[in-house]
Curated annotation (Swiss-Prot):
Function: DNA ligase that catalyzes the formation of phosphodiester linkages between 5'-phosphoryl and 3'-hydroxyl groups in double-stranded DNA using NAD as a coenzyme and as the energy source for the reaction. It is essential for DNA replication and repair of damaged DNA.
CDD domains: BRCT_DNA_ligase_like (cd17748), LIGANc (cd00114)
GO biological process: DNA repair; DNA replication
UniProt-recorded Gene Ontology molecular function terms: DNA binding; DNA ligase (NAD+) activity; metal ion binding
Catalytic activity: NAD(+) + (deoxyribonucleotide)n-3'-hydroxyl + 5'-phospho-(deoxyribonucleotide)m = (deoxyribonucleotide)n+m + AMP + beta-nicotinamide D-nucleotide
Enzyme nomenclature, EC number: 6.5.1.2
Keyword Transferase recorded: no
Protein name in the entry: DNA ligase
Superkingdom field: Bacteria
PROSITE patterns: BRCT, DNA_LIGASE_N1, DNA_LIGASE_N2
Active site, renumbered: K114 (n6-amp-lysine intermediate)
Organism this protein belongs to: Aliivibrio fischeri (strain ATCC 700601 / ES114)
Gene from which the chain derives: ligA
Domain BRCT: 591-668
GO cellular component: cytosol
Length: 668
């Protein structure tokens, strides 16, 4: 075989396996074998530079830095879309189309998520990528060919056969959530400013003059339409064109769907909106298009948008508002959290008047002042936060935020441990705020789960000095509780009954209820499974603690410090005297097969045939250590429906993923 033939064979193999990995998400080769083939290609091209072609996989690493971008002209304008913000506006869109159509009304739609990225045009000539450009103003864009070549999921050469001689593919370059988080983590470690959101990160990465930088960024791409078509024909259905493009190696959003009526379109919108936070990428709505290409051509365009497509936008997740004040709150472990008091603003479907500012470092990074106009962001159930300041609107009477040096509740000195971002009040349960939060945690659902003892009741109990420690809760009588607001005799008796019921608990729940720093539900369960008894945990050494799954140096130190504190020992003794108890944990019978012995597993997503706690218990019986987060230590992720960010991280780390059916098969 000649050098040229060897090179062609390597290119074909590398392109095929890149498609399997980046587009199909179904690799056939180990990473090491792919890397070996790539090194062989690079070695041949290094010895024979005259054989290097623009479609070679080696060109994905980036080339020489540019002085600036040249411009390209779009042969067919890249238009934007009109927006709809309600079902009524969507219905009006359908009516406008049907009023214009001479023949049949629209009966089939193609729907897809509206990705929050950067629109690009890819031009393939004879199956090879020869040009890539940004949308720009719709008629003129920037030539970003070298940067686009570095995006692994975009084919440099089309697969299969039947593609037109000249084919322009349009789509969105975006940065998946997991990649965005990893990129920002690396930036923070290097002391660099992180990106505000994935869209900014994608746009900034794509417009780098040095394509080697773009090559290091976790960019992806989904095709959504075509432009120029010469020397061939495509399907007459918009959806089938997607399928056609995918067969040629171009990525297609897996959420794209055909809908047979506007009722189905509305259901699709609602479904995507509900699953928005679980998707691997940021979206801000759904795009609805007439599926029939002939009808698209009949409907045509207005000045800036097609008549046959519309973007049904989600409620805004970012809005402008004014920072009126900052309130410093004290948490269960004494952490001081600055809370922004905002001019109320409707964002992400709710009215927001408070947002977290995290800590002193975040305030300094934002450079925010009281009185500033700020951009507030709310995503799903995430606490709203300020993402940036509009400094051009800063008023002359704005005030710098002064971080306190004393606890705003008890007046104790605040301290910041070296290496931590959080400032803390070290007064412990002497501080009323910490006492309230510790008691709320103690009775919470994942801890002792005391029904009827909500936050407001706990706050009243502390304010009236009826309770100081968790053990005091079990001394309360129905008669005493009736002095509280909205607490009649029946409600009071229900609380007492719930407290008595809560005395029978489990060791993991009890450990979690104590509020040891960094010891969540999963870590508490791992400690209990490892040591079997509370007494063994209390006397465990640092070396013994770090042998426990999910327990590192920091958590081990927190556990040691907690049990070394005399006050905490007294609280535990008092609770046991009040009748708190749990069943004995027996050591595992080594004669029983344990196929998951020593395996670290994570459960995520919605399970339909199993209850989460049942699945967790069954996995533990098989020897697995069930944790709450995905890391390099994770062996298996069991992913139910709408698995979200944990699934994305597992895929990024190469963790084995099993679905619910595989989980059931394993348990059986």
């Amino acid at each position: 075989m000649s050098i040229e033939q060897t090179l062609d064979e390597l290119k074909q193999q590398l392109n095929y396996h890149a498609y399997r990995y980046y587009v199909e998400d179904s690799p056939e080769l180990p990473d090491a074998e792919y890397d070996r083939m790539m090194q062989q290609l690079l070695s041949i091209e290094s010895e024979h530079p005259e054989l290097v072609t623009v479609d070679s996989p080696s060109q994905r690493v980036g080339g020489e830095a540019l002085d600036g971008f040249t411009q390209i002209q779009h042969e067919i304008p890249m238009l934007s879309l009109d927006n709809a913000f309600s079902d009524e506006e969507l219905e009006a869109f359908e009516k406008r189309m049907n009023d214009r159509l001479i023949s049949k009304p629209v009966s089939l739609f193609c729907c897809e998520p509206k990705l929050d990225g950067l629109a690009v045009s890819l031009l393939y000539v004879d199956g090879k990528l020869v040009q890539a450009g940004t949308r720009g103003d719709g008629t003129t864009g920037e030539n970003i060919t070298e940067n686009v070549r570095t995006i692994r999921c975009i084919p440099l050469t089309l697969q299969g056969e039947g593609w037109p001689t000249r084919l322009e593919v349009r789509g969105e370059v975006f940065m998946p959530k997991a990649g965005f988080e990893a990129l920002n983590e690396r930036a923070l470690k290097r002391g660099e400013k992180p990106f505000a959101n994935p869209r900014n990160a994608a746009a900034g990465s794509l417009r780098q003059l040095d394509s080697k930088i773009t090559a290091t960024r976790p960019l992806s791409f989904y095709a959504y339409s075509v432009g120029v078509i010469e020397g061939g024909e495509l399907e007459t259905s918009h959806y089938q064109r997607f399928v056609q493009l995918k067969s040629w190696g171009l990525p297609m959003c897996e959420e794209t769907k055909q809908c047979h009526s506007l009722t189905e379109v509305k259901a699709y919108y609602k479904d995507i909106l509900e699953r928005r936070d679980a998707l691997k990428y940021e979206i801000d709505g759904v795009v609805i298009k007439v599926d029939d290409i002939a009808l698209q051509e009949q409907l045509g365009f207005v000045a800036r948008a097609p008549r046959w497509a519309i973007a049904y936008k989600f409620p805004a997740q970012e809005e402008l508002t004014v920072l009126n004040d900052v309130e410093f709150q004290v948490g269960r472990t004494g952490a001081i959290t600055p809370v922004a008091k905002l001019e109320p603003v409707f964002v992400g479907g709710v009215t927001v008047s408070n947002a977290t500012l995290h800590n002193a470092d975040e305030i300094a990074r934002l450079g925010v002042h009281i009185g500033d106009t700020v951009i507030i962001r709310r995503a799903g159930d995430v606490i709203p936060q300020i993402v940036s300041v509009v400094e051009a609107r800063r008023p002359t009477d704005s005030k710098a935020i002064v971080y306190p040096i004393h606890c705003p509740v008890c007046g104790s000195n605040l301290e910041r441990v070296e290496g931590e971002a959080v400032t803390r009040c070290g007064a412990g349960l002497v501080c009323q705020a910490q006492r309230k939060e510790a008691l709320k945690h103690f009775v919470s659902r994942k801890a002792l789960d005391v029904d009827g003892l909500g936050d407001k009741v706990v706050e009243q109990l502390v304010d009236k000095e009826m309770v100081e420690t968790p053990a005091d809760l079990f001394k309360l009588s129905a008669g005493l509780l009736t002095v509280l607001e909205r607490m009649g005799p029946k409600s009071a008796q229900n609380v007492v009954d719930a407290l008595n019921k809560a005395k029978a608990t489990t060791l993991p729940r009890f450990l979690y209820s104590l509020g040891i720093r960094e010891v969540g539900e999963a870590t508490a369960a791992n400690l209990a499974a490892h040591f079997y008894t509370l007494e063994a945990i209390q006397v465990a050494t640092f070396e013994q603690l770090i042998e426990v799954s999910d327990v590192g140096d920091i958590v081990a130190k927190h556990v040691l410090n907690f049990f070394a504190e005399p006050h905490n020992k007294t609280v535990i003794e008092d609770l046991q005297e009040m009748g708190i108890h749990w069943p004995e944990i027996k050591a595992l019978d080594e004669s029983v097969p344990q196929p998951l012995a020593g395996k670290v597993v994570v459960l995520t997503g919605t399970l339909h045939k199993l209850k989460r706690n049942e699945a967790k218990a069954a996995l533990q019986e098989l020897g697995a250590k069930v944790t709450g987060s995905v890391s390099k230590k994770t062996d298996i992720l069991f992913a139910g429906e709408a698995a979200g960010s944990k699934l994305a991280k597992a895929e990024e780390l190469g963790v084995e993923v099993m679905n619910e059916e595989q989980l059931i098969e394993l348990l059986n």
